[in-house]
Swiss-Prot record:
Main function: Component of the ribosome, a large ribonucleoprotein complex responsible for the synthesis of proteins in the cell. The small ribosomal subunit (SSU) binds messenger RNAs (mRNAs) and translates the encoded message by selecting cognate aminoacyl-transfer RNA (tRNA) molecules. The large subunit (LSU) contains the ribosomal catalytic site termed the peptidyl transferase center (PTC), which catalyzes the formation of peptide bonds, thereby polymerizing the amino acids delivered by tRNAs into a polypeptide chain.
GO cellular component, one term: ribonucleoprotein complex
Provenance organism: Medicago sativa (Alfalfa)
Name the record gives this protein: Large ribosomal subunit protein uL5
A Gene Ontology molecular function term of the record: rRNA binding
Cell location: Nucleus; Cytoplasm
Keyword line: Cytoplasm, Nucleus, Ribonucleoprotein, Ribosomal protein, RNA-binding, rRNA-binding
Gene name linked to the record: RPL11
Presence of the UniProt keyword Repeat in the record: no
Gene Ontology BP, a term: translation
Family: Belongs to the universal ribosomal protein uL5 family.
Length: 181
């Protein structure tokens, strides 16, 4: 009976809080709406548009112009999309893909690698995956009433995130010199 119980503390287990899929087109108009359609097809949710913060004349971008779209996915759908995204990357990430706060991100070149059928009218879009990891109890930092800080011992660190990735997905973490592009 005792051997069946987990010896690890359930409050220390790391889980995916959310997955953010981002497609940055760099211009508003038809290409951006087609990119939004790709995200909606992939996630089943309506994407949100991001605006440019300031004007960049060399790129032809004006301030407050819609230039990108993103969607935030949580729960089982997030795990499913993350699995398919990591499969495209062959479960290999660089060490620099992980942040100090325990989050990680990566990009893919073509959205059709995720299993969406190619549509000539839509085209092919690359996208970024951003994964936010947390432990149970992180709500104390987000709640409205009696807000508190998450303790240093309880926060997810870069090493924790890399270890979680290696154990959960049997992933490989490469240094910059090992990466073959």
């Amino acid at each position: 009976m005792a051997s069946e119980k987990k010896l690890s503390n359930p409050m220390r287990e790391i889980k995916v809080q959310k997955l953010v899929l981002n497609i940055s087109v760099g211009e508003s108009g038809d290409r951006l709406t087609r990119a939004a359609k790709v995200l909606e097809q992939l996630s089943g949710q309506t994407p949100v548009f991001s605006k440019a913060r300031y004007t960049v004349r060399s790129f032809g971008i004006r301030r407050n112009e819609k230039i990108a779209c993103y969607v935030t996915v949580r729960g089982d759908k997030a795990m499913q999309l993350l699995e398919s995204g990591l499969k495209v990357k062959e479960y290999e990430l660089l060490r620099r893909n992980f942040s100090d706060t325990g989050c990680f991100g990566f990009g893919i070149q073509e959205h059709i690698d995720l299993g969406i059928k190619y549509d000539p009218s839509t085209g092919i879009y690359g996208m970024d995956f951003f994964v936010v990891l947390e432990r149970p109890g992180y709500r104390v930092g987000r709640r409205r009433r009696c807000k508190a800080r998450v303790g240093i011992q309880h926060r997810v660190t870069k090493d924790d995130a890399m270890k979680w990735f290696q154990v959960k997905y049997e992933g490989v973490i490469l240094n910059k010199s090992q990466a073959i592009v």
